Amino acid sequence: MPISAQAKSIAIWGAGREGAAALDYVRSHRPETAITVLNDSPLSPSALAALGGARVLIGAEAAQALSAGTFDVVIKSPGVSPYRPEVEKAKRRGVDFTSVTNLWFEENPKAKTIAVTGTKGKTTTSSLIHHMLRKAGLDASLVGNGGVPALTQKTAHEFTVLELSSYQTADLKHAPTIAVITSLYPEHAPWHGGVERYFNDKLRLARLDEKTLLVTNRADPRLCEAFTDRPNTLWYNDRDGFRVADDALFRGAAPFAHPHFPLKGAHNLANLAAALTVVEHLGLDPTACERSLADFAIPPHRLSEFSVDGVLCVDDSISTIPEATLAALKTFAGRPFCLILGGEDRGQSYTELYAYLKERPPRFIALMPANGKRILDELAPLALPFERQLVEDLGQAVDACFRRLEKGDLLLLSPAAPSYGQFVNFEERGRRFEALCRAKGGGGA
């Protein structure tokens, strides 16, 4: 049991998937230990029932107990920032903070691990690696961000692929065997207390131990600056490795055929380049691995396509930054389109996106809260040649777009902003978009 035997009082901060995994873990390993569940907001009756009678502290009461150093150990869920004042106060009182991911590493010190992070591309890249390993006959599991908490993995595997968000790398204490960092753009600044700290928390994955093999992206200037002199590093989008050029994939100077790869866009080819770099390092044949992708299940809400009365609707709800929306637009370049933009305002710059829209204007843009008004105001002096409208919600956005769409057009939900405020997460936003669109045409195809 990695938690100190001297710990008499353990708190679990967060009652979501990772909190539930932590609760099961502590109860099975330390049934005699007092457990308290902390949560920032009130829990529903069903969520309370799932805690099985554990003591629960909510909101200010939880913060007060933390600041007072009431607990010996706190297992923190990823959504809780380690930079919050109550965390700093608790640490000064000797409270030990850990996480489900850290506990898993401590339980599995000899595991072969492939940890994947990046502002964008981590889900697709980790899924590709996992798929290709399994298709090659290797025993591999996939855990982490947005999926199965690592600690719920009860049996050892030959390889464990971990998808890690910046919330999970920020307080990571254990280095993986292989680290993959796909991209680095400004994101999650409020949670991390600034963009530079966000960058450093992401880069931490490869800085814990120089013996970790790093696979990273030569085309990303921030990653180049961070790791140019790092030993034990393999680059993709590099002259000699797997690279993307002119919307095609190459291995060095030679084209690398990828007829079985089901994903569109140069950004997804970059994800494939990262995954192929990893599996080739592990001794697998890249061509055979690419062939195995014929039945790869595309992660949802990432350029997910469906048709409604001759209109191609694309759910790219995962696009929470303008760089991701740019990548989506380039994927469908040349097709008349309407675009749905807007969400939580994190102060991101849309300058490059505006420049692209000037060169390739849409029929119409629907701008959603909360930053839709800011985008509308920023567009006003640019005199761009397309119609735009501020809407109150996604339903109004879809209605406004369908009034202007013609057969053969594209309707793209790629908001360039997080979903919080109107939706629980980007998945809910994507599901709602599809339901609204299908209601326009009797089900789509």
Residue spans for each PLM region:
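Nucleotide phosphate-binding/pyrophosphate-handling subdomain across enzymes
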Residues: 2-10, 21-25, 258-362
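Short internal beta-strands
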Residues: 35-40, 215-218, 338-341, 361-370
